[in-house]
């Protein structure tokens, strides 16, 4: 029997604390800045992997029931979820993942930031035209094929309305899909949104034909813990005061959550390889003779 994997990371360095930035009205509309101190359970890239999401939530102590087509969630006392984006595409159950997350966000049980895949799906749902769509996006549109038009529109509105990143716990915690440089924390600018969604490319292409991303975490010296995903890694990756929790569930890896402020990660294994990764990040599988 497979069991959730847990690990704890202790902060070894305490950078000088940066002052909380004052936001203007426009920025406040774009950015969710909350004094909520948690505790939080932050979940990495789901990519439509509903079964693994439900298993991970159970491991974290959340009880989920489905009643009349709706998800009803009972969280552990005092805890809230936060989703680090890329809820959708590539996996087997994108519509139901959205049903679950939308319900939790609207009931005040969860926070959610968008990922680049969420933005792509919202745009495609609005267009109602699958022509030219390929791969994981096409799969999601096919899954939405039997859904009512009202739910398609509701899903697009939800994804469109997500703030680019969250600043939580009085500035001590930042959740952004692709991470975020310190100087962009608390910014509602287009530049901050673009970075939070997709990061920053160096302009180079690697041997797999993929753009090489700027390693912003290596230069990060901020006091806020930044929790992000976007680039799959074999196990949670701690660099300075940041952690990447996209452990590639949709590619056959794990779905991971970070418990905050405990700094403990909890992971459940993927039940299948739902999509092929162009770039290997998981160890080679060992097969018996």
Place the predicted regions along the sequence by residue.
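Active-site neighborhood of divalent metal-dependent phosphoester bond hydrolases
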Residues: 76-78, 90-172, 182, 193-208
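Acidic, His/Gly-rich catalytic cores of divalent-metal-dependent hydrolytic chemistry
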Residues: 9-10, 14-24, 35, 194, ...
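Active-site-proximal beta-strand elements of phosphoester/diester hydrolases
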Residues: 40-47, 173-179, 243-245
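Divalent metal-coordination and catalytic microenvironments
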Residues: 45, 86, 115-116, 140, ...
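Active-site environment of divalent metal-dependent phosphoester hydrolases
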Residues: 48-51, 89-92, 119-122, 182-183, ...
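A short acidic-Thr-Gly-centered motif at the start of a beta-strand
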Residues: 27-36, 73-75, 101-105, 166-170, ...
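N-terminal active-site segment of His-dependent metallophosphoesterases
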Residues: 2-98
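A short secondary-structure junction signal
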Residues: 178-179, 184-190, 238-240
